Amino acid sequence: LMIAGRQYLTTPSNPLPIELAEITLKEYSDLLSDSVKVYEFIYYERRIKEIKMNVDAFFDAKRHYTTLYERSFREAINYDYKEEAYVEFNRCLINFIASFKSFVEHCEIRVKSIFGSTSDEVLEFKSYLSNLFDNKFSYRFFIKLRDYAIHVGYPIENVLFSKYTFNPAGTDCWYEVQTFGSKNKLSSSNTFNSRIRGEIVNQEEPFDISLYIFEVYDLIINVFRKFLSVASREFIEPANRFITLSEIHNQEDLSVTISKIENGRINFHSKLLPIALAKKIIANC
């Protein structure tokens, strides 16, 4: 029987939670603190989802306009879909770059807020990002492409619609939509440093910017994993504590409960512990 004014580890149940063990006030507070840290993971998970949605939007647009282009050989398309495609591809690309760039910056700021701006953890995370910028053209190009989009213009200069025929009868056709950047315009912009301008010049023609999107997305997933590793005490350690607690009590659903006397009766206030989310964090590391 749970006693008023004490704290318990419980399993959720109606009408009353089921007591597993009495815990101290410090243990109760620590579990609530760990819960806050683990639930913060949802924010970062959503940001990754946002980035992936922007990737998907770009390639969904490619499929959509490729289908429209193919249809145009069979029926009239009564609006300027090619002009719309130009705007849509640039919109999706800019959204993708903005979403991953702000995500990386937010991770960096969060590490500083946890450990302090002069900490070894901040140095480790900054070093990781610096190495990424130094060693991956796609990453440093897209980071600076955001500035280009803000200060100069659309990064995609030309959307090319192509039809390829593989037999004289023209019955076997392949349709393609490509998104090209202008090497001349990009390489002449002071938005990029001399190294990146030279690298743009050396890229193969035609310069299809979309070919870098998946590579950059994979790099951002690695940044996320590095962030979780560096900030392990905020995410991984609390998650592991919840998993251990779940294993000790052989329960997938755990809660903490405090009992209080209110208006002459005992009420039980419970908070569910994020066991499933803790397992997801560990799976992502």
Feature names for model-found ranges:
Residues 1-90, 121-285:
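Acidic, Ser/Thr/Gly/Pro-rich intrinsically disordered interaction regions
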Residues 88-134:
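Flexible secondary-structure boundary motifs
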